[in-house]
Design a protein with these regions (language model features):
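An N-cap/entry alpha-helix motif that binds or orients negatively charged groups
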Residues: 4-48, 111-116, 120-121
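Conserved, mostly hydrophobic/aromatic
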Residues: 17, 60, 82, 123, ...
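Glycine/Thr-rich beta-alpha phosphate-binding loop at enzyme active sites
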Residues: 26-33, 37-40, 181-194, 228, ...
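Short beta-strand/loop segments at the ligand-binding rim of alpha/beta enzyme cores
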Residues: 51-59, 136-143, 207-223, 280-292
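Active-site beta-loop-alpha junctions enriched in small/polar residues
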Residues: 63-65, 87, 146-150, 179-181, ...
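A gly/proline- and charged-residue-enriched helix-loop-helix capping module
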Residues: 85-137
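Active-site-adjacent beta->alpha loops and helix N-cap segments on the catalytic face
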Residues: 90-99, 121, 134, 182-213, ...
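Active-site glycine- and acidic-residue-rich loops that bind
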Residues: 148-160, 188, 217-236
Length: 295
């Protein structure tokens, strides 16, 4: 019965534009989260990673709940961890609509959202409310941080430092998103002096906080072997706490979305994401955690 109901709901949602469906899902999850009582993740294979006790290893990646509006509702679904964001210091509308495209025959989506979000002030307020209610019993909450579109690349690291300072007391872990393809120039922060300056600055910011909160970096699936190995070298050198592989890809199968700009996710990304995960696993210290995303 549950499967039949899900298929019917899916059919109804697919009659609506993708972004409308997404917003409707967030609204529904907010209602679910407002139900009384404590909220616990489904007990699965418990892991202690990043110094945190994960009740199960299945998490929700950033990008779904950009503004931490539905954390409690999502937690009711049983996730071991939920990553909210990407959030930027100042609110921004993102790219022009339409900017989200479904390809159900390929089990894929292309998006060029552009870090649309309500800004850090709004998310701090949301997370403060969640912490004050104290209903999440074991669900790990991470915050994914990005730079504003109009922040020059040479000052981009400042936006990430602001995020570390704003969310250090509210997040269980923090993710540095330097791999979205939908913010001009952002991926260059994965290379050369940009990466080294970034890691040096954020680790210094992390060390200044009263509480140690793990810092992870989210990487692109489109890195070549040389760039990936360089990232691993610097991640190890600066003792970053973990890596998330991967963000969306700019590559396209020949029969999918050739005319749409943006990042491709879903089944066509799986193999590429898996190869990057293997590459990072073989070049990082065995104790460096990797979160697998994509596909």
């Amino acid at each position: 019965l549950r499967k039949v109901m899900f298929r019917q709901i899916e059919k109804l949602l697919f009659l609506l534009p993708p972004e409308v469906s997404h917003n409707l899902a967030i609204t529904s999850l907010k209602t679910l989260g407002a139900m009384p009582g404590p909220i616990k993740p489904i007990l699965g294979t418990k892991k202690k990673v990043l110094g945190l006790d994960f009740q199960n290893c299945l998490g929700l990646a950033a990008g779904f709940d950009k503004d931490a509006q539905a954390v409690e509702g999502l937690a009711r679904l049983g996730f071991g961890f939920i990553e909210v964001g990407t959030v930027t210091p100042r609110p921004q509308p993102g790219n022009l609509k339409p900017r989200l495209f479904r390809y159900p025959d390929h089990e894929a989506v292309i998006n060029r959202m552009g870090f649309n979000n309500l800004g850090m002030d709004a998310m701090v307020k949301k997370l403060n409310g969640i912490r004050a209610r104290d209903r999440l019993k074991g669900t790990i909450v991470g915050v994914n941080i990005g730079k504003n579109k109009d922040t020059p690349l040479e000052r981009a690291v400042d936006d990430y430092v602001i995020g570390i300072e704003r969310f250090n007391d509210l997040a269980d872990y923090l993710t540095l998103n330097i791999s979205s393809p939908n913010t001009t120039g952002l991926r260059s922060m994965q290379t050369g002096d940009h990466l080294e300056r970034m890691l040096d600055t954020v680790k210094n910011a992390q060390s200044r906080q009263k509480k140690y909160v793990p810092l992870l970096v989210k990487v692109a699936p489109d890195l070549n072997k040389e760039n990936a190995e360089y990232m691993c070298e610097k991640i190890t050198e600066y003792e970053l706490d973990g890596v998330i592989t991967t963000n969306t890809t700019l590559d396209r199968p020949s029969n999918l979305g050739q005319n749409e700009e943006g990042g491709l996710s879903g089944l066509p990304l799986f193999q590429k994401s898996l190869e990057i995960l293997k590459l990072f696993r073989s070049n990082l210290h065995p104790n460096c955690p990797i979160v697998g995303v994509g596909g």
